[in-house]
Curated annotation (Swiss-Prot):
Tagged with keyword Calcium: no
Protein's recorded name: 4-diphosphocytidyl-2-C-methyl-D-erythritol kinase
Any one GO molecular-function label of the UniProt entry: ATP binding
Family from the record: Belongs to the GHMP kinase family. IspE subfamily.
Keyword set, alphabetical order: ATP-binding, Isoprene biosynthesis, Kinase, Nucleotide-binding, Transferase
Species this protein is from: Pseudomonas putida (strain ATCC 47054 / DSM 6125 / CFBP 8728 / NCIMB 11950 / KT2440)
Amino acid sequence: MQKLTLPAPAKLNLWLHIIGRRADGYHELETVFQFLDHGDELSFALRDDGVIRLHTEIEAVPHDSNLIVRAARMLQAQSGTTLGADIWLTKVLPMGGGIGGGSSDAATTLLALAHLWQLDWDEDRLAALGLSLGADVPVFVRGHAAFAQGVGEQLTPVDPIEPWYVVLVPQVSVSTVEIFSHPQLTRDSLPLKMRPVPEGNSRNDCQPVVEQNYPEVRNALNSLGKFTEARLTGTGSCVFGAFPSKAEADKVLALLSATQTGFVAKGSNVSMLHRKLQSLVKKSSA
């Protein structure tokens, strides 16, 4: 196979608790990740000259600093391959939105190039490499909804309900560093003792600080909160609410469209990236 096109799905933090701070400054978290059937798209074409080249209309991030390029070059170096790739990014997910855009792009890149370069790398090895790029990358590599601990890299598969979501996208980018360094951030939530993880935990410890500092996010939460429980994902800026049907979610988004930007997507416990990869494996073995 010389060319490959794959999705890079969004994720939600259904809830997020901060239970402590480590000596290295990183925070200890407990959260549940679930995927959305909505995301970026990446296409990969094989090169035999070892060059990694990203083609995108997004100019906010320098080419060599882009997580996609960093992921590709890291996999190239660690595997010892002499192959390269042209990569085309169709960007849909917002940057600074808390729905995993950059991390998801990096994970899709690792999985796609491992496939395209015919590397004998399993998920464990790719996830470990992904962690060096960002704490959220491993869950996208694994591709299953998960209860996450540590900085978000210790993953236990879970299967929460899969509703339809309205996701509002405030026109502001929230700085994760700013939120996690804020003096008013809650850092002492009690670790969960129950297993399996209860679904009733409906709190994001970052939300009060983000609401206080970003009025656009506060307005989005208030708007969506008139129809269902609205919550921040990650450190934002995106907020979400669950609905039992697409029709109901579409109706609410339409009612909010005069003042809010957003989208409707289905929650999924197996990412659309992994569903696509599984279908490719089935086709190749047929």
